[in-house]
Amino acid sequence: MVRKILSTGFVLASIGLYSQTVITGEVHDTSGNAIPNVKVSFEGSATETVTDGNGKFIINIPSQKGTLTFSAENFHPFRRSVGANTPVVYVVMKEGSKEIPEVVISTQKKLEVNKLNIKNLDAPMTVNVLNRAVLQKWDINNIEDASKMVAGVNPVKQFAGFQFFNIRGFDNFVVLYDGIRDERHTITQSAPVASFANVERVEFLKGPSGDMFGHSALGGIINIIRKKPTYTTQGEAKFTIGSYNTYNVEMGVGGPISNKLRYRVDAGLMNTDGFKGIKEKNFNSSLMLQYTPDHQNTLEFFAQYNNDYYGADAGVPATNDGKPYDWINPMINLSDKRDYLKNEKKEFYLKYKHRFDFGGTFDYKLSYFDDTLDYLMDEVLFTDKTTKTLSRKNGPYHFKHVTRPLMNQLDFSFGFDTWSLKHKMIVGNTFSYLDRKTWNGDVTEGTSGQNIPIVDPVLGMGERRVDITKVKSTEEIVTGFYFQDWIEFADRFKVLLGGRYDYFDGVYDDTRLITAQPNLKKETHHNFTYRAALSFQPIKNFMTIYASSSSFFKPTRPHDHRTGKVFKPEEGIQMEAGIKLEKKDRLNVTISGFYIEKKNLLVGHNVRSQVGKAYSRGFEVDADAEIFKGLYAKVGYAFTDAFIGKQEPEPGQVDISHNKTPWTPKHSFSAWANYEPRTFMKGFGVGLGVFYTDETYRTEKNDQTLPAYTLLNGAIYYQAKNNIRIGLNVENILNTTYYNNALSSNDLYSNDPADKPYQATFQINPGRNRNYKLTISYSF
């Protein structure tokens, strides 16, 4: 009898053991980022687990087959059939569409801009994110308007469509698209940025980031993330009409082609007569394919084409304190109607990602773009107060930049332990080849106007003909090797160490007649940049105190093409400390202080010089909060004291010691409040924002200034249950007259000394007056 009982027990135990099935897997979002703290449950039982920091899980299910459910905050629930024949599963969860506080305050989002896939709360650096919900609420579809929402970032737009950014007192920055560098800004500082028709979010990383992204990243990084394919069919369409006879159409759709292949297609078309008659036309289209043959491998292909036209705006002549001449209406566009900036860009990249069983990843990126900037403009205005006339005595300036960079990047990420220390590490290599040609032309037909009445100007008639006569070439090869190590000493105490070695090799041919022989010059640099940071969480998952130090390097190319002066590379360091607060996607606060030192500072534009050191110190506050249910607020403040160090001026030169750096407001402030009723009038929303920018100097001599200004903007919208949204946005509600951009004495000059008395030395651009945008959109 005992033997029978034992035998029966053994059989039952065997059956119980046999019925247990071990399932392992990973959970990622649609961008391939691991999702921690996902609840994994087996339906019909109490069996459950959660994913770890790498999105991995192991669960023993009490039967041969069944269904697992996956749930996480800010993601749609997901169900997956599993069994003995599927011991390993790879799950992709789609981000949920919730009310504004959950969407806007994305505290748990792991940021692409920090490379190590670290949560924002943990990252010992200042990062600001404008996600799709924010862009939609404020109807933002360009980088200039997006940058105004971030403390410490001052966007500057000159010569029609050339965009650059002053970040923490300096205009050295790097623009990334999906983590891939746009080298145009590092060569000539400014370049057009395409519309946001296919943009998912924008990440701003402030301060030097040479260890992660290579040369020229002193002020910071701007990473523009495009929309990705999804596992379910999703799409949206948006139509906007507005002031200045503006219309904008955007459409996008994505989803599965098969179980392993997904797509995303986006397109946008914008046309406007523009404020002051400054016309603009943008066309943007893109395709992304994502292929996942199994849970370990992902292949991504992306192609984009944009063709943009920007009308000219040379501004209006002004006094050095930023006031237009009292006999000129600042709202008149004095530029020749035939002047233009055209930008055509074709971009491609291929990405491959492999996930190893031990948790590491291998990433490969290959990218190429072909960009043409065609520019023609009478930049300098000559005016005669007696006759109230305008002339363009210099004639138009023309160039065509053709930029073709090829970039290759390899990253290997992995984790390991040394004694009690946990490491998350990345090592990588980048290689880039840049080919750039600049063609200059002479206008042989369609001369510039002279003695044009300013009251009722006729600003250009007929076509212009440009004959290419000169060329300048640039070829650069940059090879970089880098590492970062995220070390966890304890659950609340972590250290980030990073370093990068760059080898820079450039060959340059000065501007010459296209019939002349090249005169090549060579420049070679070796440089090491670093980052060291500490992160401590006194209150776990709520508060982080951090401190960091990082460095910067920028090749200045061999000389100034206008004067022939040879310049040294610019270098710099930053020290930063701050506090971050986050709570369940209801609160996201960063308070940071910084000190930056820059060596071999370059100043000027028309005539450039290298003057030694410059410094920037300040603090910033960025806060997002849901004050109560339905009321969301975003506040940003930046204090930036950036100045040039002690100088020994050359004979005849102005002493600029301790002068403020150009384009740097000492104080800037923005605040936006958005309210959505939760019961009565549910679906309606209203928002109000205020933006303040302090006065800014436009030259290193501090002799030309744009006054401070304050703007009030607003929005009202209705979100219907059928996914239709109608919104009205009003910019500059109080119809304030203000000036936000300018051409200074650094940019303006006279070809003939006899004309100098009539030449404008300061041409300012007024910002848009009160204007409206009405948008209707549909998503599915």
Across the structure, where does each feature detected by a protein language model lie?
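Short, acidic, small-residue-rich periplasmic hinge/interaction motif at the N-terminus
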Residues: 28, 39-43, 71-75, 85-134
